[in-house]
Regions:
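C-terminal structural segment of proteins
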Residues: 1-334
Length: 334
């Protein structure tokens, strides 16, 4: 299939200065509108001419969407705050370093300087068939090219695949789920906060999107409660190269240990399914147990129950098992 690359289609550029103005344009344009944050995902789509919006709404001039603010119950991060700003913020590094660690492993320094937190959690699937313009399920077709005997599916899903086997590529998403963050959206009905884990969706809900934003909606901020401030955190990202690459799998956990036992825990993985997965079964099973190797072993086995590998990604099952094991029992050799 021939694709014209590096030649953007014509579009109208709108540069609002307020959230209200931005949302007004997005509501008017609906499916014809496109949100431009840092541009790390957007420009790939536009240059390859796979996405052809009529109106691009550039949010770089909306000051309300930028910055990190402490609140009475935690911290609020504007959706247009860059990943570098997240990594370097003193309060995040002190109290919520799980997010700083995950953001610091995104791509390269140059991309983190430009890319935003809102963009990282809202980026689209990286499946090469979908990205190359093939008429797959996610693009409105009637086949998943990756889920065929000869399909290139080494990086794809092992859990909860439903027609499409592409995975969510965000590094910060599992960290925000583990921190019990709220994603704040502005819709036609006003402000709508949702739990981080509910912001992401799989193909069983809508095969064309990885998140719940409808045309006309806008992600404005991410709020992290103080509930998990200073907890024991663990983040690990496995990728083919130690620079630049998207994750094959990643894991994030937040844990409070009292008298040698796990009192509270939240753990999430990404790269295993179309959405980041909070492992509630694992959380329930290990609560009250010591955070040691044996508990980690049990957690890892529970995490991969029901996993079904594709032709070329069977390695993800032991990888996910060991990542979860290390997130619970520390960094002992798996």
């Amino acid at each position: 299939m021939a694709v014209i690359r590096d030649v953007m289609p014509a579009f109208e550029l709108v540069q609002p200065s307020s959230i209200a103005d931005a949302q007004k344009v997005l509501e008017e344009q609906r499916e014809n509108g496109w949100v431009l944050a840092g541009g790390m995902d957007s420009f790939d789509w536009l240059k390859d001419r796979i996405k052809k919006p009529k109106v691009v709404v550039d949010l770089s001039g909306v000051a309300e969407l930028k910055g990190i603010r402490t609140t009475t119950d935690g911290i609020e991060i504007g959706a247009m705050t860059t990943l570098t700003e997240v990594v370097q913020h003193s309060v995040i590094r002190e109290k919520y370093k799980l997010l700083a660690e995950s953001a610091e492993l995104v791509a390269s320094p140059q991309i983190r300087n430009q890319g935003t937190l809102g963009g990282n959690v809202s980026q689209d699937a990286r499946c090469w068939y979908y990205r190359a313009g093939w008429p797959c399920y996610r693009a409105g077709g009637n086949i998943c090219y990756a889920d065929t005997p000869e399909g290139r599916n080494r990086e794809h899903a092992i859990l909860y695949a439903d027609r499409c086997v592409a995975v969510n590529p965000s590094d910060t998403a599992p960290a925000l789920i583990a921190l019990d963050a709220k994603f704040v959206m502005r819709t036609s009905k006003g402000e709508r906060p949702v739990d981080a884990e509910d912001y992401f969706i799989g193909p069983e809900i809508d095969i064309t999107r990885l998140h719940i934003l409808n045309p006309g909606d806008l992600l404005t901020a991410i709020r992290i409660p103080s509930t998990w401030a200073g907890a024991k955190f663990y983040f690990e990202k496995v990728r083919d190269r130690n620079v630049w690459d998207f994750a094959l799998l990643n894991v994030a956990s937040a844990m409070v240990v009292t008298s040698g036992s796990i009192e509270r825990i939240r753990i999430a993985v990404n790269g295993a399914a179309a959405r980041p997965l909070r492992l509630k079964v694992v959380e329930d099973a290990i609560r009250g147990k010591p955070p040691n190797r044996a508990t980690g072993e049990m957690a890892g086995k529970l995490a991969v129950e029901g996993a079904i590998p594709l032709q070329f990604n069977g390695y993800k099952i032991p990888l996910m098992r060991n990542l979860v094991k290390r997130a619970i029992g520390g960094v002992e050799e798996a």
